[in-house]
From Swiss-Prot:
One of its GO terms (biological process) is translation. Signal peptide: none annotated. One of its GO terms (cellular component) is cytosolic small ribosomal subunit. NCBIfam families: PRK12311.1, rpsB_bact. It comes from Methylobacterium nodulans (strain LMG 21967 / CNCM I-2342 / ORS 2060). HAMAP family: Ribosomal_uS2_B (MF_00291_B). Keywords: Ribonucleoprotein, Ribosomal protein. This is Small ribosomal subunit protein uS2. The lineage of its organism: Bacteria, Pseudomonadati, Pseudomonadota, Alphaproteobacteria, Hyphomicrobiales. Belongs to the universal ribosomal protein uS2 family. CDD domains: RPS2. It comes from the Bacteria.
Length: 349
């Protein structure tokens, strides 16, 4: 694999060159402004293209070395695509309110994540021994914790790089990253301060089409990093007979990007349960929401490899979900897309 390709025309069509009204500008962005049209600042895409490429390279390099990338975008038009892009590239995200101390007080955040796991396990087991009211309260607690921490519950520690949409809105996240020395790649609009951003990508941070394009490129760069990292380790996770086409958002011409629950039919080995792994089992904890206990449950059911999950058809998902009492987790947490990304990366290595 290689870094994803993009063109200045794509950026233009997505509206990446439109800044804010001239009177709302931040003077520190002056060098990135091409001019003014109808009192709107126009961003110099001749600078955006190499800056975005540099950010993509940083993401790929970080993931190739085993690092973690955290997507941060809590504004309405960014929330869904940030989550979808992080999931399909096996990375992490915050798309709800940023909790103070998410990075600088990771120990406390870890405690909340452990509580989420415990509540999840109780409810996954049917909440036996609990009253209807207690189950309802636990369900509400789970929803609240999932909204705040669902995108980072499997991160295992602070990330190695942040990718941020809208530096004004995500100032707290950027300050925490700066305090810990974590590099930040960010989309910086004409009303924002580029200081403290490691990889400044001057571009519109409000248009839905533009945000979808940025997140898609970053996700594909992360997948490239996975491929490079596995190639360096000489890993072979069980490649399909012919390479898979890389998954893209449903339609970059739309302001919203649809969540990909079940992707297109898989062009690899058919789904089957195994009596034993074929060679070394894959590290299924890399899938969102999968811990050691759930890995054991999957192994006991005959699931050891990414290719098995990648090959699941809707009826397979329904059957496994029902038998293991996963409560819709396979679709909700995007396991199939993540598994296909790992299989694709292994095939390209």
């Amino acid at each position: 694999m290689a870094l994803p390709d993009f063109s200045m025309r794509q950026l233009l069509e997505a509206g990446a060159h439109f800044g804010h009204q001239a009177h709302r500008w931040n003077p520190k962005m002056q060098s990135y402004i091409f001019g003014t049209r109808n009192n709107i600042h126009i961003i110099d895409l001749a600078q955006t293209v190499p800056a975005l490429y540099q950010a993509l390279q940083a993401v790929s390099d970080t993931v190739a070395k085993g690092g973690r990338v955290l997507f941060v975008g809590t504004k309405r038009q960014a929330a869904d695509v940030v989550a979808e892009s992080a999931r399909r590239s096996a990375q992490y995200f915050v798309n709800s309110r940023w909790l103070g101390g998410t990075l600088t007080n990771w120990k406390t955040i870890s405690g909340s994540i452990q509580r989420l796991r415990k509540v999840d396990e109780i409810l996954a087991g049917g909440g036996q021994g609990l009253t209807k009211k207690e189950r309802l309260m636990l369900s509400r607690e789970k929803d609240k914790l999932e909204k705040a921490l669902g995108g980072i519950k499997d991160m295992g520690g602070v990330p190695d790089l942040l990718f941020v949409i809208d530096t004004n809105k995500e100032q707290l996240a950027i300050k925490e990253a700066k305090r810990l020395g974590i590099p930040v790649a960010a989309i910086v609009d004409t009303n924002s301060d580029p200081d403290g951003i490691t990889y400044v990508v001057p571009a519109n941070d409000d248009a839905g089409r533009a945000i979808a394009l940025y997140c898609d490129l970053i996700a594909r760069a992360a997948i490239d990093g996975i491929s490079r990292g596995q190639g360096a380790l000489g890993m072979d996770l069980g490649a399909s007979e012919e390479p898979l086409a890389e998954e893209l958002p449903a339609n970059l011409n739309e302001p919203e990007v649809a969540h990909l629950d079940i992707a297109e039919p898989y062009v690899g080995e058919p789904f089957e349960l195994l009596a034993a792994p074929r060679g070394a089992p894959d590290d299924l904890t890399k899938l969102t929401g999968v811990g050691p206990q759930l890995v054991q449950k999957l192994n006991d059911a005959g699931i050891y490899h990414y290719w098995q999950i990648a090959a699941m058809a809707p009826e397979d998902v329904a059957k496994v979900d029902s038998e293991l009492k996963l409560n819709g987790r396979i679709e909700r947490d995007g396991w199939i897309n993540q598994a296909r990304a790992f299989v694709e990366a292994a095939a390209a290595a």
